[in-house]
């Protein structure tokens, strides 16, 4: 199938409430459609983001939080580079249900717009790919990422 360039034309960007967003992701994850759409759209952000981490870090035992992990696309890329101390959180249980079982040590449903339930300096790295977008995670979440 030909790659699509949809930019910000996806209906998800028009949704306003958390309930609308959760319902959309529930429907989008059916029959693994989300993952197939990411392939069809040539979504390379997870691979590109992990390549930056690989370029600037040499330790493979870093404690990493994949914030807004979705179906685990960033975690999969991290595993390819031998990172294994990875936790993931996402707002959508439907997305989390599609995560391969061997990617994350801990996987939790959580709203990133609320204070995170982690101690200060709990992680060496917080990766957040594709979540700071229309109607999703707000800028104040960055303060929490820095704290943890």
Predicted feature descriptions by range:
Residues 1-32:
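N-terminal, positively charged/glycine-rich alpha-helical extensions of SAM-dependent methyltransferases
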Residues 139-148:
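A short glycine-rich, Lys/Arg-flanked "PGG" loop and its adjoining helix->strand segment in the class I
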Residues 43-62:
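Conserved alpha-helix/loop element of class I SAM-dependent methyltransferases that forms part
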Residues 31-44:
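Class I SAM-dependent methyltransferase Rossmann-like catalytic core
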Residues 65-116:
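Class I SAM-dependent methyltransferase SAM/SAH-binding core
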Residues 113, 124-139:
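A short SAM/SAH-binding and catalytic strip from SAM-dependent methyltransferases
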Residues 62, 105, 124:
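Conserved acidic residues
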């Amino acid at each position: 199938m030909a790659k699509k360039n949809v930019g910000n034309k996806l209906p998800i960007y028009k949704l306003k409430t958390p309930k609308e967003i959760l319902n959309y992701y529930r429907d989008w994850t059916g029959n693994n459609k989300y993952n197939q759409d990411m392939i069809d759209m040539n979504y390379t952000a997870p691979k590109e983001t992990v390549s930056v981490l690989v370029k600037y870090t040499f330790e493979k035992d870093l404690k990493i939080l994949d914030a807004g992990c979705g179906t685990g696309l960033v975690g999969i890329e991290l595993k390819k580079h031998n990172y294994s101390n990875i936790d993931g959180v996402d707002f959508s249980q439907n997305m989390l249900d599609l995560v391969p079982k061997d990617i994350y040590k801990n996987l939790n449903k959580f709203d990133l717009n609320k204070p995170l339930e982690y101690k200060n300096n709990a992680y060496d790295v917080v990766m957040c790919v594709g979540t700071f977008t229309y109607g999703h995670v707000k800028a104040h979440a960055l303060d929490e990422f820095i704290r943890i």
